[in-house]
Structures are given as C-alpha cells and as structure tokens.
C-alpha cells in the first residue's frame, strides 16, 4: 500500500480527503498534519468531524518544517490542503524527499511567476517546481498527470467552468469575437472553515464578489486558451457550484457539432455526466464526485450549465482522481 500523509487536514476539504484516503484499497493514511501552532493538534480527527467517528480516529499531529525529512520516511504521497503561501513554501521540501505531491492550493496552478504577485499577493520563489507542475484537470491531463511528481489540483470554479468549455475550445467552436461569460454560484464552504462575518449564518446572502478581479478568472483563461469574463457569487447554502456559461459560437457551428464535441470528450470519463434531458442542479451532485453538464443552442448562442460539489469534484475528489491516474488505479477508486 502507498503511504499517504495529509497536510492541512482539518479544513472541509481535508476532512473529505481523509475519508477518501481511508476508503482507498491501495492507500494507507499515514499521518494527519496541521501547522505546529494549530489548536487542533493533539485532538482525535473524529472529534472535529463526528461523522467520521470509527472511520478516521487518528490523532492530528503538528507539522514543523524542520521535521519534514523525518515524517517522510517511507511516505509515497503527500496531499497539501494548505493555504497558498504554505503550499508554496513547503512543496519543494516534500518533493526533495522523493514523494509525489498533490497540492490543492493555487500555488502551482499557473506556470507564470507574475500571476502570483498580481493575484495572490506573494512572490513565487520556486520556478523549477512551478514549471514542472502539471495542472490536474483529471479528464484533460491524464497523460501528464501519470508522469508528474507535482500535481496542482485545479480550483473549484475553474473545474466547473473548464469542464464545460474545453470540449468547445478543443474543436475551435468558440467565436473569437466574444469572450465566454461565466456566472457561477458557490456554497459557503468554499470560503473555508475559519470563522468570518461574511460567511456567518445571518449575514450570508446571494451576491456577487470578486468582479473582474477574482484569481480564478486568469486560471480559467490560461487553461482554456480563451479570455473569459467570470463573475462568482456566494450562495446561502453549504456546498456545491452551479455555473451558467454563455458562449458565442463560431459562425456555422451546428448543434450536432456541439453534441459531438461533448460526447467525444467525456464518453469514456466516468466522473462527468452529460444529461440526456433537464439541467444540472446542485442537489444532484452534492456529496458526489460527479460533474453534470447540459447545454442548449440557439443560432450562434450556446448556454452551458455545469454543476459540481465544490469540496469534492472541485477539490478532494479531483485530487483522488489525480492520485488514481498517477499510480495506475481505476479512475473511480474510492469515489463511487
């Protein structure tokens, strides 16, 4: 079995990852780590997440950077569910110990150092690792993921958006005259587990944020190969993302071409479901690892709707897909 440690274990995504790793027949959960000053250190994991009582009861351990070499003894896989700056600082330390690193932060998603100063507010100091990192959009990068030692798991909004748009871009069906317009709403869990007034029960209201300056906009544009307009919204529900995307198609594109593009892209991809009728909903994907897609065309105008669970297909489940790809396991292992 492959020994796997999880760093940043106590966030919402960390909890989902701990459960997936524990269920995986080829992985051994060898350690759950938090920052060395975290108040969660020393607690049983299931004391934070009661639904995992009897499933993940390991003690949460503090991680000191100076101790990384010691904790990596015989470790094969490191999963980082840490803040962007933390992943930036420690990923190279784990790579130096001959582990394969799966990073769920944004620290290695775009191979351009300037991107991080502009959108994350820090200078990227690990150009070698940045250039070698593979963007882990599972259905679209399996060959590269299988050879990589640093996999940057995509963001939740980019996963929903790129899954909807990449089949069109691959076949040149998107008009160059108009940017795709993405309006997406996410559950409050996307803001993380730390308490804040903005995500408090009595304060949350469906509203846009990050207009024209959200860091996921350039991430989407970079990996799509088309500029987009992206407006995220905070919804008054726990989990899930619903993205409604308006696309101007290239002149002469037929409904048959659009359908063929999606079918070609996803006919052998078990975690993406093309709906035969109706529209994607958060209810249908909540607490699942699926991405649901549907579309409708009127002339050159196409509306595509994508739904995922932000904590799963938008984070933990996609990380597990990448682990499965990297080590040659079936794509759905531990996920369904």
Swiss-Prot record:
Protein's recorded name: N-acetyl-gamma-glutamyl-phosphate reductase
Residues annotated as the enzyme's active site: 156
Record-linked InterPro entries: AGPR_AS, AGPR_type-1, NAD(P)-bd_dom_sf, NAGSA_dehydrogenase, Semialdehyde_DH_NAD-bd
Catalytic reaction(s) noted: N-acetyl-L-glutamate 5-semialdehyde + phosphate + NADP(+) = N-acetyl-L-glutamyl 5-phosphate + NADPH + H(+)
EC number: 1.2.1.38
UniProt-listed PROSITE patterns: ARGC
Keyword annotations of the record: Amino-acid biosynthesis, Arginine biosynthesis, Cytoplasm, NADP, Oxidoreductase
Gene3D superfamilies: Dihydrodipicolinate Reductase, domain 2 (3.30.360.10), NAD(P)-binding Rossmann-like Domain (3.40.50.720)
Protein's pathway: Amino-acid biosynthesis; L-arginine biosynthesis; N(2)-acetyl-L-ornithine from L-glutamate: step 3/4
Example GO biological process: L-arginine biosynthetic process
EC primary class: oxidoreductase
Cell compartments where the protein resides: Cytoplasm
GO molecular function: N-acetyl-gamma-glutamyl-phosphate reductase activity; NAD binding; NADP+ binding
Function as written in the Swiss-Prot or TrEMBL entry: Catalyzes the NADPH-dependent reduction of N-acetyl-5-glutamyl phosphate to yield N-acetyl-L-glutamate 5-semialdehyde.
């Amino acid at each position: 079995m492959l020994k796997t440690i999880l760093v940043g274990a106590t966030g919402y995504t960390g909890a989902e990852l701990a459960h997936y790793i524990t269920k995986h027949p080829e992985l051994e959960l060898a350690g759950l780590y938090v920052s060395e000053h975290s108040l969660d250190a020393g607690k049983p994991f299931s004391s934070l997440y009661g639904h995992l009582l009897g499933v993940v009861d390991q003690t949460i351990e503090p991680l000191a950077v100076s101790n990384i070499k010691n904790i990596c003894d015989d470790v094969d896989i490191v999963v980082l569910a840490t803040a962007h700056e933390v992943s930036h600082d420690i990923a190279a330390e784990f790579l130096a110990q001959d582990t394969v690193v799966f990073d769920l932060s944004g620290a290695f998603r775009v191979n351009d150092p300037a991107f991080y100063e502009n959108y994350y507010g820090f200078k990227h100091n690990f150009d070698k690792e940045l250039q070698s990192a593979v963007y882990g959009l599972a259905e679209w990068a399996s060959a590269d993921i299988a050879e990589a030692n640093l996999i940057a798991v995509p963001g939740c909004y980019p996963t929903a958006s790129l899954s909807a748009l990449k089949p069109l871009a691959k076949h040149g069906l998107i008009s160059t005259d108009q940017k795709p317009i993405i309006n997406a709403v996410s559950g409050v869990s996307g803001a993380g587990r730390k308490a804040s007034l903005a995500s408090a029960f009595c304060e949350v209201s469906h509203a846009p944020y990050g207009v024209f300056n959200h860091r996921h906009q350039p991430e989407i544009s970079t990996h799509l190969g088309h500029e987009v307009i992206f407006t995220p919204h905070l919804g008054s529900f726990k989990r899930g993302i619903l993205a409604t995307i308006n696309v101007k198609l290239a002149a002469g594109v037929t409904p048959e071409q659009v359908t063929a593009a999606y079918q070609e892209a996803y006919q052998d991809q078990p975690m993406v479901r093309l709906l035969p009728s109706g529209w994607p909903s958060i209810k249908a994907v909540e607490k699942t690892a699926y991405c649901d897609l549907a579309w409708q065309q009127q002339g050159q105008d196409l509306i595509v709707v994508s739904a995922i669970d932000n904590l799963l297909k938008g984070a933990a489940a996609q990380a597990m897909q990448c682990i499965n790809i990297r080590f040659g396991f079936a794509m759905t292992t531990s996920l369904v």
